[in-house]
């Protein structure tokens, strides 16, 4: 516990109270300046939906605009504008392990109708289509959870 507290830079009593559920979680973060920043951020995100908040801050600095404080950007404000059409849920008991690999935030080619093989004895799920040759699409199943093997047909994402 001491190593965790030292790493996070908080007191041990704070961590203990968090674990026991005594301390309240923080509420939503709002500042008066957010109303001025959000339209500018939204315009940038609409132009390039793959940009993250760090890249948006860097591009605004490169254009000579005043820098955007990353701490004043509310969590999820950028991600809420980016639509991801490739969400799916499976009813099989291994849905969590399957969704780790097949469902991606940016809807990569593995989620665009590619089939997935579930037959590796090492517990690997490998896609037949990789987003690129340098990044194979693999995901480990949870330890102790049986592999689906051939029990269910391969899953594909509904687009």
Swiss-Prot record:
Keywords: Plasmid, Transposable element. Residues 126-142 have a biased composition (Low complexity). Residues 126-159 are annotated as: Disordered. This is Insertion element IS136 uncharacterized 16.9 kDa protein. It comes from Agrobacterium tumefaciens (strain T37).
